[in-house]
Amino acid sequence: MSDDTKKQDTAADAEVEKEMEGVPEHLRDDRGSEEDASDDLSAALESLKSDLEAAKQETLYAKAETQNVRRRMEKDIQDARTYAATGFARDILSIADNLARAIDAIPQELREDEKFKGLVAGIEATQRELDKVFAQHGVSRIAAMGLPLDPNQHQAMMEVPTDEVEPGTIVQEMQAGYMIRDRLLRPSMVGVAKKPD
């Protein structure tokens, strides 16, 4: 190495030292060794790798949550379509009840009277049409008579003392119950057998 080069290096070192005056020791980069720099780079690389892994996990969780939300939304939409007529069907049940009562109230002699045969046939046809429309929309009548009481479908209104059937068996139906597909629309109001006193 020439003297000029040594002088330049010494001058550069002196200039650097002069600039570093007043800088606290903990802020000075005195490492100087490649091993320390390599360790710092390795630590930084490991930190970045762990951050990347955490970001990947968060992305997977976000994708899974998005998929779950989409599935729930699709199910809600399907349920809304399937059970859209629930309110209307519940309201129309009282009309069906009144129509059934009207048919039951027609005495046999009026059914046979030529003047009323058309009226009776019309009321019965209306009842059949209503039942058909109910079936098209998934509304079905709940079976009750002679079956054991099912609190999910029947509402016990009274107990009837009798020895003819097992206690807990439905012996009287005061109001028909209905389901809309697999959901209860209205429970059957029933009388249930009990052992006589």
UniProtKB/Swiss-Prot annotation:
Top-level taxon in the UniProt lineage: Bacteria
InterPro entries: GrpE, GrpE_coiled_coil, GrpE_head
SUPFAM superfamilies: Coiled-coil domain of nucleotide exchange factor GrpE, Head domain of nucleotide exchange factor GrpE
Keywords: Chaperone, Cytoplasm, Stress response
GO CC list: cytoplasm
GO molecular function: adenyl-nucleotide exchange factor activity; protein homodimerization activity; protein-folding chaperone binding; unfolded protein binding
Chain intervals for the UniProt region annotation (Disordered): 1-48
GO biological process entries: protein folding
Bias type Basic and acidic residues, positions: 1-31
Places the protein is found: Cytoplasm
Function comment: Participates actively in the response to hyperosmotic and heat shock by preventing the aggregation of stress-denatured proteins, in association with DnaK and GrpE. It is the nucleotide exchange factor for DnaK and may function as a thermosensor. Unfolded proteins bind initially to DnaJ; upon interaction with the DnaJ-bound protein, DnaK hydrolyzes its bound ATP, resulting in the formation of a stable complex. GrpE releases ADP from DnaK; ATP binding to DnaK triggers the release of the substrate protein, thus completing the reaction cycle.
Family per record: Belongs to the GrpE family.
Binding partners and assembly: Homodimer.
Protein name listed in UniProt: Protein GrpE
